[in-house]
From Swiss-Prot:
Belongs to the MnmG family. One of its GO terms (cellular component) is cytosol. This is tRNA uridine 5-carboxymethylaminomethyl modification enzyme MnmG. Coiled coil: none annotated. NAD-binding protein involved in the addition of a carboxymethylaminomethyl (cmnm) group at the wobble position (U34) of certain tRNAs, forming tRNA-cmnm(5)s(2)U34. Its cofactor is FAD. It is found in: Cytoplasm. Keywords: Cytoplasm, FAD, Flavoprotein, NAD, tRNA processing.
């Protein structure tokens, strides 16, 4: 049958990418359908019960700055919060939260069920309806046809999913869920480059069978950091302790004894796994000189005994898993509630996408999340948000939007994927961003919330809090610049108490704050006044202390923006451009870069080749500027 309502946007999949995509499109006013195989698993944390971390929290904050759900759900579900790299510079500081799976899923579902313009429907999608290279709808497993102007695919690990435990394997999208085989078959019929990747998860442990006294305690920060720019510590549930233990040489011997029955070593798994989250058998094999590996023992929630042993993801046979777990200090009598497993699944080459995450071959079709070769909730959520935004814009015939590399980690993520592709699950790190001093976790709202407001993503409550923060920053910055301290005053004596070289002339509080030995708390004592909002104080301190570095990065960005804004026609014939080697021509044809700057980032494309392209465009009057 044909469903009576025609939608602007259909989102397939209710994981972290799908929920952000659906919420974004609906917030912008598009009539949106979220199609999921099971409404009970909306927002489910399929692997580790945590949000954030190095590079990842930057994405969470950017999602939040654009009105997304992930940070708000984390504040409502976080049972331990920590700031990582707190002693390092502001560019690499990152917030990480341990989350209660049940509370997190409930928070996401509440947002979905109470979002205007959003309809939920439980059915697996089996087919895409494509007419004249344009997607026009979806057909479900029971033959229901949903018509729409745009479709966002966020299929996670479900496309052709195969679960491996030892030499046994079976079809599955994750433990307990069927794979999306019909949809996987349909995508292979379309002009996409399909590959295989794999990921894994550790066995879950019953906390009642664990000796925590044999482990090191790891408490969160107090006071707890807040994930959302509009969040509050009052939202945080009870805070709990995590634990740390380590594998032993006995553990490694047991693991090695199972190598002959490991699907990874036996060649049963063709997909490449995540480099930065390897299985324990991979770690033991690759780092044979190490006699132990760290394991973070993370409770999965306040109302469950289930523990997540972070660091021992595995697809070894269950008998080996059990022996290995029980050789670890504190786990001698451990009961495994769920065995660890590896899952292999289809992904599509992200070089087949545009920066908006729309496919190059089929108009109105967008991909987000693990289907694009990424790993991680945060990477998925950020892509989902961007895909939802652009699906909504296209459905209303409005100009597309995406952030540049100098505007957001989301811009770095997408540009990396579509420019270089990926042969392994892609994870975000701060080191991937060349402008990381500008793309800090703390200023994601200053970078993106105004854009989010223009796009219709940011509600009045968030906009008011953002406006108050901006006003507070301007006011405090002005106070620090205008308040002068004289050496021969009481305030001057207080200042000299912190300085290695005493003041010889009067200085503003801002000048003093630029001195390496002075921090904002000192300034508050010297000036006998401080900003009421600690977020304002942090922002002002960073802006003033790192002003020179930030200014230099801004100048570099301005120089490069000329090429970033020079568009390349997607149908440009590289074969007729003189001076390009066949290798460079092929790389350009494979990627089909959208801008001159993107072309310059393709491995092997030389500055001379970029110059030849510019000359060709100028001769044929094809030079165009874009505003994205």
């Amino acid at each position: 049958m044909e469903f009576p309502t025609r939608f602007d946007v259909i989102v397939i999949g209710g994981g972290h990418a799908g929920t952000e995509a659906a919420l974004a499109a609906a917030r912008m006013g598009s009539q949106t359908l979220l199609l999921t195989h099971n409404i009970e698993t909306l927002g489910q944390m399929s692997c580790n019960p945590a949000i954030g971390g190095i590079g990842k929290s930057h994405l969470v904050k950017e999602i939040d700055a654009l009105g997304g759900a992930m940070a708000r759900a984390t504040d409502q579900a976080g049972i331990q919060f920590r700031v990582l790299n707190s002693r390092k510079g502001p560019a690499v500081r990152a917030t990480r939260a341990q989350a209660d799976r049940i509370l997190y899923k409930a928070a996401i579902r509440h947002m979905l069920e109470n979002q205007p313009n959003l309809t939920l429907f439980q059915q697996a999608a089996d087919d895409l309806i494509v007419e004249n290279d344009q997607v026009v709808g979806v057909v479900t497993q029971t033959g229901i046809r949903f018509n729409a102007k745009t479709v966002v695919l966020t299929t996670g690990t479900f496309l052709g999913g195969v679960i491996h435990i030892g030499m046994q394997n079976h079809a599955g999208g994750r433990a307990g869920d069927a794979p999306a085989n019909a949809l996987a078959k349909r995508l292979r019929e379309l002009p996409f480059n399909v590959g295989r990747l794999k990921t894994g998860t550790p066995p879950r442990i019953d906390a009642r069978t664990v000796d925590f006294s044999a482990m090191q305690q790891q408490w969160g920060d107090d006071p707890t950091p807040v994930m959302s720019f509009i969040g509050s510590r009052d939202e945080h549930p009870e805070q709990i302790c995590c634990y740390v233990t380590r594998t032993t040489e006995e553990t490694h011997d047991i693991i090695r004894s199972g190598f002959d029955r490991s699907p990874m070593f036996a060649g049963n798994i063709e997909g490449v796994g995540p480099r930065y989250c390897p299985s324990i058998e991979d770690k033991v094999n690759r780092f044979a000189d190490k006699d132990s590996h760290q394991i973070f023992v993370e409770p999965e929630g306040l109302t469950t005994n289930e523990l997540y042993p972070n660091g021992i993801s595995t697809s070894l046979p269950f008998d080996i898993q059990l022996k290995a777990v029980r050789s670890i200090p504190g786990f001698e009598n451990a009961h495994i509630l769920r065995p660890g497993y590896a899952i292999e699944y289809d992904y599509l080459n992200p070089q087949d996408l545009r920066h908006t995450l729309e496919t190059k071959f089929i108009q109105g079709l967008y991909f987000a999340g693990q289907i694009n070769g990424t790993t991680g909730y945060e990477e998925a959520g950020a892509q989902g948000l961007l895909a939802g935004i652009n699906a909504s814009l296209r459905a209303r015939d409005q100009e597309e939007w995406y952030p540049r590399r100098d505007e957001a980690y989301l811009g770095v993520l997408v540009d990396d994927l579509i420019t270089m592709g990926t042969q392994e699950p892609y994870r975000m790190f701060t080191s991937r961003a060349e402008y990381r001093l500008i793309l800090r976790e703390d200023n994601a709202d200053l970078r993106l919330t105004e854009t989010g407001r223009k796009l219709g993503l940011v509600d009045d409550e968030r906009w008011q809090k953002f406006s108050e923060k901006c006003e507070g920053i301007a006011k405090e910055r002005s106070r620090l610049e205008s308040t002068r301290i004289h050496p021969n005053t009481e305030a001057g004596e207080r200042a000299n108490g912190y300085l290695k070289q005493p003041m010889t002339r009067d200085q503003s509080l801002a000048e003093l704050l630029r001195r390496p030995e002075i921090v904002y708390d000192h300034i508050a004592e010297i000036g006998a006044e401080r900003a009421e909002d600690p977020n304002v104080a942090d922002q002002v301190e960073i802006e003033i202390k790192y002003e020179g570095y930030i200014s230099r990065q801004a100048d570099e960005i301005e120089r490069l923006r000329k090429n970033e804004n020079t568009a390349l026609p997607l149908d440009l014939d590289y074969d007729v451009i003189g001076g390009l080697s066949n290798e460079i021509k092929q790389k350009l044809k494979d990627v089909r870069p959208e801008t001159v700057a993107q072309a310059s980032r393709i491995q092997g494309v030389t500055p001379a080749a970029v110059s030849q392209i510019l000359v060709h465009l100028k001769k044929r009057d094809l030079l165009k500027k874009q505003s994205a």
